Amino acid sequence: LPGKVLLNAGGKALLAYHIERLQWSGYPVIVATTTEKSDDIIVEFCEQHRLPYFRGDEQNVLSRFYECALHFGLSVIVRVTSDCPLIDGTLIKNAIDAYLLAGNLQIYASNCLVRTYPRGLDFEVFSMTLLEEANKKASLPSQKEHVTPYLYQNKSANTILKHITNQQDNSQFRITLDTIEDYQLIKILIEDYQAAILPTSAIIEVLTQHPELQAINAHIEQKKI
């Protein structure tokens, strides 16, 4: 879906909602975009909203993330993708707190390997140590495009996988942004149900009570890596 992150709902770009919800975590949010001219508009958005950003390679997203983390002096990285405008920063904060409490730089924590949350809430937490290793050793195009496969496919004996799961399996719900149907659903959720300010549990409740909403994009098959 071209230009999807700047599509409008309720008078604002979806990227604005995404950033606002990420800020619930209490941690800095950095936009890692590309050097392509087509992404100048993303940079303009960041500058208008005073958001830190980094521009890197379009295809090798792994190198872009590594160089971004290096540029900003990060020791821990939370990776999210821009197609999740209703992501929940509170869930991310809880995951970061647990990660920091564990105090092990070899942990890769994610809520998307064992899927119990709706698609569209995906996040990964890992150290600069692991990101640096992946950047040095990843060789497959898929590992470079999707950033973390080298880590979670356990190509490194150093990685400890930590699955973040929900008590209830809500993986049947889809609130990601890949297709026009996804956009239609997200727009309705934001404009008619105030989803932009709701926690995940309340959004799930709306979808449960309104199966006609879930049906809008239920037929979409997610692309495989």
Language model region names:
Residues 36-101:
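Short phosphate-binding loop-to-helix
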Residues 25, 73, 104-105:
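Short loop/turn motifs at secondary-structure junctions
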Residues 23, 47, 155:
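Anion (oxyanion) recognition and catalysis
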Residues 29, 44, 87-173, 184, ...:
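Conserved core of the sugar-phosphate nucleotidyltransferase
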Residues 179:
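Short, conserved phosphate/pyrophosphate- and ester-handling motifs at nucleotide-, phospho-/glycolipid
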Residues 196:
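Polar, enzyme-active/binding microenvironments
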Residues 8, 55, 79, 110-111, ...:
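Structural signal for conserved beta-strand scaffold positions within catalytic alpha/beta enzyme cores
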Residues 1-33, 38:
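N-terminal glycine-rich phosphate-binding loop and ensuing alpha1 helix
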